[in-house]
Each structure stands twice: as structure tokens, then as C-alpha cells.
Amino acid sequence: MATVPAAEYATASVLAERGGTPVEVALAVAGPFEGSAQHVVQVNRRAEAPTASRVTVLRDGLLDDSIRGERWEVLLERTSAGSWAISEVKRAWRCRRGAQPDRFSTVRCP
């Protein structure tokens, strides 16, 4: 997966600092959804008082001629103040055309 520069998710970072949940933050990173299916999976480190969270956003059937789907991985860490901070964001694409249309790639679709 390709690492996304922090400048591209600055608005979501502010949401995290202001008390947004990990899922809210991940959806803010991924942006508006226009497609047929979206799946969100959240995995926390420690169940009752999570210290870290990984949120995966899978999107398929996008309304785009070249991009069939997207996969976002958003890693968050709990701060000493109790809010969340984004520690890393990665992204991959699934293309409609090409040699492997059923696999995610770190290269944007043509």
C-alpha cells in the first residue's frame, strides 16, 4: 500500500484531535463515498480502553471509469489527552482494466 502524505488528511487530523472516533476519522480521510459497497473494519489494541486502532475502509463499485475500488488503512494512537492522533495512512487501488483487476495495487489506475 502507498503511504499518504499527512498534508492530504489534515482535516481528518483536526477531527481526531477534537474527539472524533477512529471510524469517523477514517471516513474523513477516505472522503465522500460514491459506489455500490463500502465496508469498514476497526481493530483496537485493548478492548475496553483502546490505546491504538486500525481502521480499514474498503470501497467497491466506484463510479469511475478506471478505478473499481479503494482500500484505506488508517492507524491511530490514543494521545495522553485522551483524543486520537493519526499515525499513518495507506491507500491502494483496484483498477477496472489491467493485468490484475481483482487485486489492489499501490499504483493509481490509468
Regions found by a protein language model. Name each.
Residues 9, 14, 39-43, 92-95:
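Generic preference for hydrophobic/aromatic residues in regular secondary structure cores
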Residues 16-75:
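Mature extracytoplasmic domains of secretory-pathway proteins
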Residues 5, 11, 37-39, 51-53, ...:
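Generic structural motif recognizing short loop/turn segments at the entrances and edges of beta-strands
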Residues 74-103:
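Short beta-strand edge/turn micro-motifs at domain boundaries
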Residues 1, 38, 68-70, 79, ...:
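Aromatic-enriched hydrophobic runs in primary sequence
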Residues 1-17:
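N-terminal low-complexity, Pro/Thr/Ser-rich intrinsically disordered segments
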